[in-house]
């Protein structure tokens, strides 16, 4: 999914559908394939992220002078951060392409969303190269970081990218020279691209990402959304029980008794 072709295929492929009461039973192989992919359960974090992204994208259209506000999705490993990110990205992609379809006969597809992974040991040049790879921007061996960045900003703006999602952001360490340069690159991109940025990473508040001058710049523009343990009760709602109920309703098991999970 870290290329436009891969992302487009993901976003436009129908997600797994839970079994319907009037549908014929699925085969064992079909049920195994379904549970392997499974449905996305709409957790409180996903609900919050969807609402916040929609709001920031609307606000960002009217902000021209400085970097737009951003979001950071944080939490422990395997807490659903990437799942939340991909769910929101797909929703944004589908909503935008419905409202703004490519003109008939156009060779240029609408590109509303970009998804980039921070590579291990990322430098500013390797990260901006990942941005270039997403849209298949030609990169010559002798191109400098500045030249690649200029090409990325020009192409992303021309393609109409509105949402940039950067995953594995915890891999950045602004206390190191390379980490500081990479953080500066991200700041530069947020100021030059007319897009909303959403980051995801493991427990980012416990990392150097939020400390020091560069960390303060990033944190100062970002709203934190935590993917953590679900509370048993929140006001009049029961988030943990609600999620378990949604999971159970989505199961396709032949001998499972509803209500026992």
What are these regions (language model features)?
Residues 1-69:
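A short, basic N-terminal segment
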Residues 73:
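Hydrophobic anchor at the beta1->P-loop junction of P-loop NTPases
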Residues 81:
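Conserved lysine of the Walker
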Residues 84, 88:
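Hydrophobic positions on the alpha1 helix immediately C-terminal to the Walker A/P-loop
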Residues 91-103, 137-139:
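Post-Walker A helix-loop "phosphate-sensing" segment adjacent to the P-loop in P-loop NTPases
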Residues 111-140:
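Conserved NTP-binding/hydrolysis module of P-loop NTPases
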Residues 155-178:
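Conserved P-loop NTPase "ATPase switch" module shared by AAA+ and STAND
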Residues 171-175, 185-260:
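The catalytic "switch" region of P-loop NTPases
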């Amino acid at each position: 999914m870290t290329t436009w072709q891969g992302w487009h295929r993901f976003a436009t492929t129908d997600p797994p559908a839970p079994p319907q009461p009037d549908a014929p039973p699925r085969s064992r192989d079909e049920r195994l394939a379904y549970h392997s992919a499974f449905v996305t359960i709409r957790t409180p974090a996903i609900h919050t992220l969807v609402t916040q992204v929609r709001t920031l994208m609307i606000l960002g259209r009217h902000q021209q002078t400085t970097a737009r506000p951003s979001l950071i999705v944080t939490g422990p490993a395997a807490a659903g951060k990437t799942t939340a990110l991909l769910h929101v990205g797909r929703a944004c992609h589908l909503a935008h392409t419905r409202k703004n379809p490519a003109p008939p006969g156009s060779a240029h597809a609408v590109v509303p969303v970009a998804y980039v992974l921070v590579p291990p040991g990322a430098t500013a040049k390797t990260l901006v190269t990942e941005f270039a790879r997403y849209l298949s921007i030609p990169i010559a061996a002798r191109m400098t970081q500045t030249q690649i960045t200029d090409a990325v900003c020009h192409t992303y703006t021309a393609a109409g990218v509105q949402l940039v999602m950067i995953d594995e952001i915890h891999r950045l360490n602004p206390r190191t020279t390379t980490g500081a340069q990479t953080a500066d690159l991200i700041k530069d991109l947020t100021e030059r691209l007319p897009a909303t940025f959403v980051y995801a990473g493991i427990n980012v508040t416990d990392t150097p990402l939020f400390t020091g001058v560069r960390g303060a710049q990033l944190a100062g523009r970002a709203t934190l959304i935590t993917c953590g343990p679900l509370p048993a009760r929140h006001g009049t709602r029961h988030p943990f029980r609600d999620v378990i109920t949604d999971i159970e309703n989505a199961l396709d098991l032949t001998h499972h008794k509803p209500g026992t999970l």
